[in-house]
Amino acid sequence: MASKDVEEGVEGPICWICREEVGNEGIHPCACTGELDVVHPQCLSTWLTVSRNTACQMCRVIYRTRTQWRSRLNLWPEMERQEIFELFLLMSVVVAGLVGVALCTWTLLVILTAPAGTFSPGAVLGFLCFFGFYQIFIVFAFGGICRVSGTVRALYAANNTRVTVLPYRRPRRPTANEDNIELTVLVGPAGGTDEEPTDESSEGDVASGDKERDGSSGDEPDGGPNDRAGLRGTARTDLCAPTKKPVRKNHPKNNG
C-alpha cells in the first residue's frame, strides 16, 4: 500500500527498479518504452553488478556498460550457505586432485624404475585399474570445478567491480534524401563506344541521307524514280571506290 501511495503522489517518469521519481537523473538504457523507458543509473548499475546481466530482459538490447575494478578489493565477500558449500567443494576437489596426481605419478615412477620381479603382475594390474578410475573421477570433477568456479568468479566480480551504464543510442534511420536516390548511367569515354552499329541502323541512316539529298527542294527530278535509283547507285559507287595512290616516277622499282 505504501508503494502505491508513493506512485500515485509522484508526477513524471518513475524508475522501474526503485519505483521512485527519476527527475533529471534518469537515462534511457535500452529500447523499451512506457514505464520501462527511464531508470536511475545508480539503480541499474547496482542491479547489473549483482545479477551480472548484460542485456535487457524485455527488448533484448545489450546495455552499453563500462566495468571498473574497485580500489580496495574484498577478498572474502559475504556469501550464502549454498555459495559457501560450493566454495568448500571447489577447494576439496582441487586439493584431492593435486594429491592424487602426485601419488599416481610417484607410484608409476617406482614401478618403472624397480628391478624385474619386484612387483607381481596382479599388483601392477591393480594399480593400472586404480589409476584409470581415478582419471575418470578427475575428468568429472573438473566439470564440477568449472561450474563452481564460474559461480565463485561471478560473486567475486560482483563484490569488487562497479558497472557504469551509458545511455542507449538508437539506430539512425535513413533520411528522405537517402530514400530517393536515383541511379544514373555513366557515359563512356570520349571517342565513342566499342559497339558496332547493326546492319538495320546503317541502312536506315543511308536511306535517311538519300531522302534528305533528294527531297531538299521538295520537287521530284525529271527522270522519275528510276533516275533517283541511278543517282543513289552512282553516289554509293563514288563513295565506295578506292582511292589510287600517286606513283613516284623516280622510284627505283618503277625505273626497273
From Swiss-Prot:
Keywords: Early protein, Host cell membrane, Host endoplasmic reticulum, Host membrane, Host-virus interaction, Inhibition of host innate immune response by virus, Inhibition of host interferon receptors by virus, Inhibition of host interferon signaling pathway by virus, Interferon antiviral system evasion, Membrane, Metal-binding, Transferase, Transmembrane, Transmembrane helix, Ubl conjugation pathway, Viral immunoevasion, Zinc, Zinc-finger
Extracellular side: 105-124
Pfam family for this entry, one: RINGv
Region described as Disordered: 179-256
Taxonomy, superkingdom: Viruses
Entry keyword annotation includes Lyase: no
Annotated Zn(2+) 1 binding sites: 15, 18, 40, 43
Biased composition regions of type Acidic residues, renumbered to the chain: 193-203
Cytoplasmic side: 1-83, 146-256
Protein name as catalogued: E3 ubiquitin-protein ligase MIR2
